[in-house]
Amino acid sequence: DLLPRDRYMWASVQTVRGCPKHCSFCSVWRTDGQEPRQRGVDAVVQEVVDLRRLGFRFVALADDNFYPVTLEDLELASRRADHGRLHELKALRAERFELMEKLAKLPSDMNFFTQITMEAAEDPEFLNAMRKAHIKGALVGVESVTAAGLKDVYKGFNLYGDDLVDRLRQFKAHGIHVL
């Protein structure tokens, strides 16, 4: 409460902590861990509703990575026949979809923004759910446009060149502005 509420442009809500990546420039995986932990969906939605009552219409989902389970994560767990891990990942993914379904039911004047990895562009189901949930923008990490640069920052999972451009276009095609 340092400033009167009407001086704030937007509010923020954190829905998940931790990130399974280990990018060299990022402290999150060291400070918050590599195992994503989600807040309860109902608690998150209630916080958003409370913020709306206070007059906020733009909310940043201040997660370090709004897409903590990739399709590749699911595929690897399945191939390894790691049933426990596969169950955990599917549950985490289901919670993400549940959250987005509930956000989609909020009044249409609510708009959200988040941070996400490029891998989400490979998941049209997830991008569609984001669009329906009024997530209008995403900060997508593009730390380098070369393979060598990505390797240097431990982001070999990201893309470069035409592949990078194609993935960024996927976000746009689903109504999500990339920053």
Model region roles, listed by residue range:
Residues 1-178:
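Radical SAM [4Fe-4S] cluster-binding motif and immediate context
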